[in-house]
């Protein structure tokens, strides 16, 4: 307990120390410089609304998981980034405001990694009780630890400034600090979901295409329509020892059994899963099926009306379940109810390519693949909660279907890219790629691409033409698996000698796959994970993939938050380790002892890590001439041996 408290305090302390680098603090400093501390401010000498200008290479609009991953990936590769978020916390639908579970691929071997997995393991480390408000700050820490990111919270994009066909700047408003911002950049990434940068004139779609538009057999509508999936307000429950009846507000709906006669699970069809309202159990229920109609309401412009309607539904549902005579929810109390509806669907930009049902069903074999999905084609009924019967229909698809780069940049605004649920897809394909783990992968891909565009002085279209293979290599090196290919291992790693049992560390497959382990085990203190060369080589970087147990589904936040059970770190992950190099002895001693003799050199520690919680670890150190490199595991997170998927040297 004491250690966890210290870790949490360290997290908060690190956050507070990092804040002064942010653009909002810059605004405060500017205001302080312009006022006399000994002068009373009045209507004659005070400015009610400040106006501040800022600029960066890359402007990311939207601080959900796709925006966070885009900003962090671009910043880590060297670009100057501004991240704009209209809420007081990051995370979007995954934040404490909305509490939607992070889902994506359903198959163990295809589970998402990259920055998303890093944040989820960080959450285990700092937030083992899985409290949502602390999860907000875990995401926050991931962002503010990056020196190349300036974060603008509570800041809404209101307009754009155009320079011909390109976006030159965004106009923003922060009602929290009464400040107007003009934020300029070279590239603009729309990760808002609703597509606010449509203000630029970028082409987009809203609604559902006709079945014939892309030949999508899972659709039934013969004509285009404005129907979308609806928004949801979620509930969280608390286990209780006593039953106390629940009284909903007078303005809530009041339901009876007659309202749910059609909501009984029925047999499924092969390849199709039929989902109904889960009104018969309280345990393990996050109430995703409480959904406001995307037919009756516009999910963007009717947001206030949807909020009220969803509150009426949510209170009414809980009153019905809690007080039901069969006692289905008697052991639970309502612990939390959302206030902001989480959105599923609104806007989809138009890119050079539009992902469709057939692309998903066939596996998404694209030359320019940069991300992947694995959620079913999960098309929610547009009538939402008030539909009598089905809540959603899931069409089962192959796991790990590819998502191409050509879906991720505007067809008519040359410096606009996008990530998350506003990328270029049909409505049916969207029903699978909209979930947050997939959106996070897309965000990391777009952020990495954006940095490369800045670095090479090209455009999104130019990157597709000239550098797509390089982008794919960088993504794989950053622990983003891509379908139908494996990571390229560095030539220096492949040129080394190592024991036969160590070969999986350099096969480029950084996870269990098709029944193959693809890893090695090492007990603390063992020195057998070693690469050697006949002649000294120059080494300054190492890369590891440790086992974070991608199979564990418990990384998503709990549906019952009030539990006191702590979530442990993945036991086979390396907690502490050293990287050591062997410095060759002088030439005469080598000739005397034989250069192949391990005693002919001295082992030197060039890097040491403690309390590691990352799956991907990259370390740099001063360039050294060496004929051997090894990792020495000092400690695991509980297992007798650590499990390591990759060990690369450069």
Predicted ranges, named:
Residues 9-20:
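Bacterial N-terminal signal peptides
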Residues 25, 29-39, 45, 169, ...:
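Flavin (FAD/FMN)-binding glycine-rich loop and adjacent Rossmann-like elements that form
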Residues 489-511:
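Predominantly extracellular/luminal regions of secreted and cell-surface proteins
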């Amino acid at each position: 307990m004491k250690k966890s408290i210290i870790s949490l305090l360290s997290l908060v302390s690190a956050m507070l120390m990092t804040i002064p680098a942010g653009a909002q603090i810059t605004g405060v400093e500017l205001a302080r410089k312009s006022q006399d501390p000994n002068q009373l401010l009045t209507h004659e000498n005070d400015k009610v609304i400040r106006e501040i200008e800022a600029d960066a290479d890359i402007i990311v609009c939207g601080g959900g998981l796709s925006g966070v991953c885009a900003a962090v990936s671009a910043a880590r590769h060297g670009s100057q980034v501004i991240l704009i978020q209209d809420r007081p916390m990051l995370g979007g639908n995954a934040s404490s405001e909305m509490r939607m579970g992070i889902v994506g691929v359903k198959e163990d071997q295809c589970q998402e990694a990259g920055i998303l997995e890093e944040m989820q393991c960080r959450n285990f480390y700092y937030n083992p009780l899985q409290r949502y408000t602390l999860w907000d700050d875990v995401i926050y820490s991931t962002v503010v630890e990056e020196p190349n990111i300036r974060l603008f919270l509570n800041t809404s994009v209101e307009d754009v400034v155009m320079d011909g066909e390109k976006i030159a700047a965004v106009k923003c408003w922060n009602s929290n600090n009464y400040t107007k911002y003009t934020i300029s950049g070279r590239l603009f990434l729309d990760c808002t979901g609703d597509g606010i940068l449509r203000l630029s004139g970028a082409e987009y779609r809203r609604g559902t295409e006709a079945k014939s538009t892309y030949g999508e057999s899972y659709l039934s509508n013969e004509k285009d329509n404005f129907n979308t999936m609806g928004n949801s307000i979620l509930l969280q429950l608390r286990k209780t020892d006593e039953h106390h009846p629940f009284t909903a507000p007078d303005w809530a709906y009041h339901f009876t059994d007659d309202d749910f006669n059609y909501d009984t699970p029925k047999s499924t069809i092969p390849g199709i899963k039929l989902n109904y309202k889960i009104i018969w159990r309280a345990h393990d229920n996050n109430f995703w099926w409480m959904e406001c109609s995307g037919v009756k309401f516009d999910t963007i412009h009717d947001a206030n009306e949807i909020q009220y309607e969803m509150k009426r539904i949510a209170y009414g549902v809980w009153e019905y379940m809690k007080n039901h005579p069969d006692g289905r929810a008697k052991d639970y109390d309502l612990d939390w109810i959302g206030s902001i509806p989480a959105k599923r669907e609104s806007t989809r930009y138009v890119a050079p390519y539009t992902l469709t049902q057939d692309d998903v069903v066939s596996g998404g074999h694209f030359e320019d693949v940069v991300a992947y999905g694995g959620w079913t084609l999960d098309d929610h009924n547009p009538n939402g909660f008030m539909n009598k019967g089905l809540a959603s229909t899931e069409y089962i698809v192959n796991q790990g279907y590819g998502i191409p780069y050509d879906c991720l940049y505007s067809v008519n605004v040359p410096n606009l890219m996008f990530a998350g649920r506003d990328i270029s897809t049909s409505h049916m394909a969207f029903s699978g790629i909209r979930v947050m783990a997939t959106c996070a992968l897309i965000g990391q891909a777009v952020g990495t691409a954006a940095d490369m565009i800045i670095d090479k002085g090209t455009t999104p279209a130019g990157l597709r033409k000239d550098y797509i293979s390089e982008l794919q290599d960088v993504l794989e090196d950053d622990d983003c698996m891509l379908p139908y290919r494996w990571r390229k291992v560095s030539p220096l790693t492949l040129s080394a000698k190592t024991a036969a049992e160590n070969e999986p560390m350099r096969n480029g497959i950084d996870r269990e796959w098709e029944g193959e382990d693809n890893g090695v085990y090492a007990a603390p203190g063992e020195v057998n994970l070693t690469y050697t060369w006949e002649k000294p080589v120059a080494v300054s970087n190492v890369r590891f993939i440790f086992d974070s147990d991608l199979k564990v589904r418990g990384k998503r936040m709990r549906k019952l938050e009030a539990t006191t059970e702590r979530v442990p770190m993945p036991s086979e992950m390396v907690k502490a380790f050293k990287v050591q190099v062997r410095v060759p002895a002088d030439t005469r001693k080598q000739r005397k002892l034989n250069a192949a003799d391990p005693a002919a050199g001295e082992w030197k520690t060039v890097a040491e890590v403690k309390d590691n919680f990352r799956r991907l670890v990259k370390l740099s150190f001063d360039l050294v001439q060496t004929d051997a490199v090894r990792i020495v595991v000092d400690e695991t997170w509980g297992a007798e041996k650590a499990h390591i998927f990759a060990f690369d040297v450069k």
